[in-house]
């Protein structure tokens, strides 16, 4: 499935609800560098308690799997490392949600996101500096060489315009 289709499945409900989010991971890499395959969308989110119910209601249909409210609430309370996903069953596409918690890099993603238009949908994408640092962290923590290829691609396409102070 083209990444624009993944965006069409998951981003419009977030925008309609006014959810504070930033796209990270493979979709962000594609936006800041060369096309590559991805089968999900990764999102850093800040969801106050009442917003959790709205998010789950937006994906409450037979076409989506969403975790129970209690699971999402528990993941949102974690100071770091929280995670839950919502899956579009017919296409097997998924959105991985990462609660911002206490991670300053996630805070930067939510504060300094950049708006991009993809497939007719406006999405908030974490700045390339955040993507570079996060990809390096994932590689350090045992990730694949794909993370390094993604970093190289971002540096090749947007390297001169990166905020080097933000990378420090």
Language-model-derived ranges and their functions:
Residues 1-168:
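Compositionally biased terminal segments of proteins
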